[in-house]
Amino acid sequence: MKKQFGKFGGQYVSKELTSTLKNLEENFFKYCNDDDFKKEYIYYLNNYIGRPSLLYYAKRLTKSLGGAKIYLKREDLNHTGAHKINNAIGQILLAKRMGKKKVIAETGAGQHGVATATAAALFGMECTIFMGEEDIKRQKLNTFKMELLGAKIKPVKSGNGTLKDAVDEAIKQWVKSSDDTFYVLGSAVGPHPYPTMVREFQKIIGEETKDQILRMEGRLPDTLIACVGGGSNAIGLFYPFIKDENIEIIGVEAGGKGVETGEHGAAFADGRVGVIHGMKTVIMEDDNGNVKEAYSISAGLDYPGVGPEHAYLNDIGRAKYVSITDEEAVEAFKYLCANEGIIPALESSHAIAYTMKLAPNMDKDKIIVVNLSGRGDKDVETISEYLNK
């Protein structure tokens, strides 16, 4: 199994974690090629999560923008309301096969926390979620859901109290307790094998999209668009299309208050190659080599780096990465609500916002597929506060 994507990825970890990661890699490789494991995973995708998720032709959105046809991949309709459950079920099934009794996870927007707590409840495992204090304030609804599902929440006070800090604390805990504990990492980040493992559990998004668009349109789309924090929903959509070279692939990062202000989460716009959370990738660093704090109105996008496979796709020119500001994302959130009766997550609203810029400049026979990675119930309070400022 490849440990790197070009010069990105790898395993930049302490000695204590090396053997744990080797054991994880061996088990993942063993079970992802095991028919019984695959059968069980697909059973839960279909009968618990509710897959395949719909590919929906957004007729009014298309008409109002006046350009390319827009399809939405409806990951918001999954059980728990986002794409995160695809990966959580896969990793916890693996944890059970490995004989682990407990799971830990980090969360930003709370969606991965809810998905992990849900899967832990389903399979009867003890669950602890690390969440930044700032994110707990922003995501009260998801915090309460996790507690209802039986998870213990560990507030993280260090740093800015956001996603990066939650990952730091979760990794520290894992070093101490890896004998009986499995770390369910929520995005396509971290040391090998996590970026590959998360992609493998999320690529169902792109595989379904391929089948669905061929059935509906008789051809593949021209453009794929997805939001990118760490980038698991995006790599899940993109991966099955990478070899289809005529398809444009666009990842949308958090522009926050504007890249020029320094308050954003757009690593590609303002980053350099460095090491974070056990991987080499593109990260936001200051001149002294310290990781900058990321900012976004969206709790799931304020990560100061990107998954290493995204860094590689950008490096070889196979995908391009753009940014959308808070203001643009909120406008897109409102626009989709008003035009399609769909309340998107703030993360997904970044992808919708870029689609709103791009689609009117494309011919009407062109096709865009946007990954609607999650639903926006969790964000309604944040939006309300933002609009009433």
From Swiss-Prot:
The coding gene here is: trpB
Q: What is the lineage of its organism?
A: Bacteria, Bacillati, Bacillota, Clostridia, Eubacteriales
Function description: The beta subunit is responsible for the synthesis of L-tryptophan from indole and L-serine.
The protein's assembly and partners? Tetramer of two alpha and two beta chains.
- Top enzyme class of this protein? lyase
EC number, UniProt record: 4.2.1.20
Reactions catalysed: (1S,2R)-1-C-(indol-3-yl)glycerol 3-phosphate + L-serine = D-glyceraldehyde 3-phosphate + L-tryptophan + H2O
Report the PANTHER family cross-referenced here.
Answer: TRYPTOPHAN SYNTHASE, TRYPTOPHAN SYNTHASE-RELATED
Which residues are recorded with the post-translational modification N6-(pyridoxal phosphate)lysine?
A: 84
Q: Which UniProt keywords apply?
A: Amino-acid biosynthesis, Aromatic amino acid biosynthesis, Lyase, Pyridoxal phosphate, Tryptophan biosynthesis
An example of a GO molecular function for this protein is: tryptophan synthase activity
Name recorded for this polypeptide? Tryptophan synthase beta chain
Domain of life where this protein originates: Bacteria
Give the family per the record. Answer: Belongs to the TrpB family.
